[in-house]
Amino acid sequence: MGRKRHWRPLVSVMALATGVSLMVAAHGVAANRAKVSPKNPQAFGTLRAVIDTIDYLDPQQAYTGQSWWAMWNVYETLLTYRHVDGPAGYKLVPGLAQSLPTVSRNGKVYKFKLRKGLKYSNGSAVKASDFEWAIKRGFLATGQGVGFYTDIAGAEAYSKNPTPGGDISGIVTNNAKRTITIRLATPRGDFLTILALLFAAPVPGNTDPAIQNGSIPGTGPYKFSNYDPNRSFTMVRNPYFKPTKYIPRGNPNTVEVALVGDADAATQRVINGQSDYSNAAIPPDRIADAKGKGKLLLRKTANTYYFWMNVREAPFNKLKVRQAVNYAIDRKALQTLVWGGLGRPTQNVLPPTYPSYRKLALYGHNVTKAKQLINQAGASGAKVTVWTRNVSDAVTAGQYYTSILNQIGLNASLNVLPRATYYTTIGNVNTHAQTGWARWLEDYPHPLDWFDVLLNGNRITDQDNNNFAWYKNKKTDAQIESLKKAPILTPAVNARWAKVEKQIMERAPWAPWSNRVFPEFFSKNMSCIHTQLLYGIDLARLCKK
């Protein structure tokens, strides 16, 4: 997920390594206590969080890690993930479904049955047909995740002329029996994990296809209220929520979330006692201060930060220019500049936590060679606009990148966009964005979430495109399509993915530079702190003293 940004009983689940270290805490503020429910002895009043941005609070539209961090506790899917720390958080478990599905031997037919008595936060009953409406709604509104569901029989045809009354033939529901049957046109090894994406969260059948930020009823432990675009939103308890052994009620009664793009300001809010938690990229010169005035958790997760180069736009339509950029970047220095070294320099698309990962070292830091390649490509003096978003670490990285492009002979300038519109702008074909900053946090732990979503030319769309490099290559596209059918990540399959990655990076549509370690900053009055590998800090399990 870039934007962000995960599982399964029928295919191998990778045990991604996670390492977190909780550091010393000092001064905080008084806890906001609530009356403790005998059903939940750790319940408390208000959790005050500060994050940098969201894109949407609409399950069929949202596609950033920050949005999903909140929405995971508002919208439930047929299958979901456990609220637990460590690798067990990658295990798929029933969500709205009463059990894991039955799957046909050919891997094409999936049968589910909903739990009894499910209701949305507005009190209306959950129907089996609401699942099909959620998928259709994504196509009707050109949602960012519709490409995940085109392997459902009839979905491709529906996508060409979507109408509210149209039908996706591969989805058959029975409201009276609470059953959902999904038939695929072709087997897809990661389909169960795709069903756990929030894009597939059922919504009431009368939900308007247009974007509905924070107003769509959900089935999770919380519901949204008081959404103020680009400023804040609030989460309160859903009175109709039915907890399961996998999905808890949640500890905070209310979650107040402020949207603050300036990392220094976000850090100061926690130090001052205005917020209990911040996920901002703490400025390097403030890390020591943060350790002394709160609790700092260093969270490792699967992510890659990179600069994309649009292969359709000059000068990046020339391979030598893209290779020059990769040689020019000092990845270690950039990581130190942006995060004080909290991360791991990389030249790979995949994070090192994946069994498909094979470390690449194609582009050693060599500015002289980069300049030579620019000259050989006839690109000296070419005008380039670097795109980034208005968040502290992205701006710093964008400034560095712009200076490097100028250093090797290009004529580059920086364009900083508002946080909320950045991805939709660079993902629009009419923008003709040449190059810029991006990151990807896994949606689910499978190479398809990286190569199919981000670098498969068959998935390019004119709007809300995730392939910012607009990279299309017949050879690697065909390999990705073939690997979709592999149900298990065997050593042989992992080796095939490693080959695809090397072939792509030899064509250099990206300049990957870091697998970041995330600093999560808490005030002293927070006690139990828990993480979930896919969704980050698990707000439902946080506690106050």
Tell what function each PLM region has.
Residues 82-87, 187-250, 254, 368, ...:
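Gly/Pro-rich hinge or "lid" segments in bacterial periplasmic/extracellular proteins
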Residues 206-213, 240-288, 411:
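Ligand-site clamp/hinge motif
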Residues 3-29:
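Secretory targeting and sorting signals
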Residues 50-105, 217:
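N-terminal lobe/hinge region of extracytoplasmic solute-binding protein
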Residues 48, 126-136, 177-183, 220-221, ...:
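Alpha-helical secondary-structure segments
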Residues 39, 228, 232, 329-356, ...:
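Detector for C-terminal structural segments
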Residues 42, 111-113, 130-132, 139-204:
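Surface-exposed binding/hinge segments that line
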Residues 123-125, 130, 264-275, 291, ...:
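Short helices/loops that flank or line small-molecule/ion binding pockets
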